[in-house]
């Protein structure tokens, strides 16, 4: 099942760039080329020159944990252009489909075979990568917050609390 707490790790950073200005595809490709790491980029189904939409795949040097994924993805989006990113693209559980295009659309595909992106380097760009207030955020987005963990069933708790809940 695709649930946030079921993700064990990611080997790719996947960024959906859905807010590219009209005619901005070449600019994004130049930004990616300047990163000096391996990447693959392709247009998504709704891509048009007047409304470009690209998906960027960045292979990682090691599997990053679900907790490491979001700060790594946000750092890379910041380097490419945070304002271009879709707000949900940083979620480790986000499902991505195979590339496809309509028969009348313009298909974009580029890749560069270089060094894989170092997870440890990305995390080292933060003073403390656990501090979500230091992560790059989308312009105009609400402050970042970690969702609270799901509370357990009070009837299955141990000790005094569990006994109280089972009685009352």
Regions inferred by a protein language model and the residue ranges of each:
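Signature for HUH/AEP ssDNA processing cores
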Residues: 1-52, 59-71, 75, 145-168
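Surface-exposed beta-strand edges and their flanking turn/coil or helix-capping segments
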Residues: 30, 54-55, 71, 110-113, ...
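Catalytic "initiation/cleavage/transfer" segments centered on a nucleophilic residue
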Residues: 62, 77-147
């Amino acid at each position: 099942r695709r649930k946030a707490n079921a993700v064990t790790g990611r080997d790719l950073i996947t960024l959906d760039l859905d807010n590219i200005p009209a005619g901005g595809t070449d600019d994004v490709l130049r930004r990616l080329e300047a990163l000096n790491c391996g990447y693959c980029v392709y247009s998504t189904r709704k891509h048009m020159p007047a409304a470009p939409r690209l998906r960027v795949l960045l292979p990682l040097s090691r599997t990053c944990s679900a907790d490491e994924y979001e700060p790594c993805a946000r750092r890379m989006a910041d380097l490419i252009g945070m304002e271009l990113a879709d707000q949900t693209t940083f979620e480790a559980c986000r499902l991505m489909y195979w590339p496809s295009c309509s028969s009348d659309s313009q298909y974009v595909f580029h890749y560069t075979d270089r060094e894989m992106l170092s997870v440890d380097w990305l995390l080292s760009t933060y003073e403390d990568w656990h501090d979500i207030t230091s992560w790059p955020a989308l312009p105009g987005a609400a402050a970042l917050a970690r969702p609270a963990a799901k509370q357990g069933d009070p009837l299955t708790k141990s000790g005094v609390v569990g006994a109280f809940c089972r009685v009352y």
